[in-house]
Design a protein with these regions (language model features):
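N-terminal active-site segment of His-dependent metallophosphoesterases
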Residues: 1-35
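His/Asp/Glu-rich metal-coordinating catalytic cores
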Residues: 17, 30-189
Length: 189
């Protein structure tokens, strides 16, 4: 599968961590088989000492039932409010990741207003499953403007929600990575 290939690449490249910025599943009511495959791939990352940070999005939001099984304790899942998590790389660099997970299908609040970059030395990454406010092609979820992201002074923004690869800004990088596997013929993957 496409996800298996991404995990294989991460292991081969010996990356420090992987960020999943939402919509790993297409629906909240995901199959047990899909969840088991997902968990198995995450276990491969953990076994390779690669960190995993997940923000669930509008397609795979985490309701009160959380999940049909527990994730490995080393898999970091962001809660429903923006929060900071720390990761220490093997090279000795402190990385601070900021994000939140959807706890309902429709998050229309301006969650970006709740992101607060810490004062710690290190690399700061914002993770946001949301939509550029000016984009009227999709329903608006967790809207933001490019200027709002720039003003947060993160070193990088890992975005989710839009399934098409887009570079919104270069300094700092504000990136929609797109999806790794198209859901239909109109999505490239």
């Amino acid at each position: 599968t496409a996800f298996h290939r991404v995990i294989e690449k991460a292991i081969n490249e010996q990356v420090d961590f992987v960020i999943i910025s939402g919509d790993i599943f297409d629906l909240e009511d995901r199959s047990i088989r899909a969840q088991v495959r997902f968990k198995n791939e995450l276990t491969r990352l953990i076994n390779a000492n690669i960190g995993v940070f997940i923000c669930f999005g509008n397609h795979d939001f985490v309701s009160n039932r959380k999940s049909d099984f527990n994730f490995h304790e080393q898999v970091v899942i962001f809660g429903p409010q923006p929060e900071q998590k720390k990761f220490h790389t093997q090279a000795g660099v402190d990385v601070y990741l900021y994000g939140f997970s959807y706890d309902t299908r429709h998050v229309v609040d301006r969650k970006i207003e709740q992101y607060e970059k810490g004062e710690e030395e290190g690399f700061h990454i914002g993770i946001l499953h949301g939509q550029l406010e000016s984009n009227k092609e999709h329903d608006t979820y967790a809207p933001f403007t490019i200027q709002e992201l720039v003003d947060k002074e993160m070193d990088y923004w890992a975005l989710g929600h839009i399934h098409k690869r887009q570079v919104l800004h270069m300094d700092p990088p504000i990136i929609y990575p797109g999806n790794i596997q198209g859901r239909h013929k109109n999505e490239q993957g």
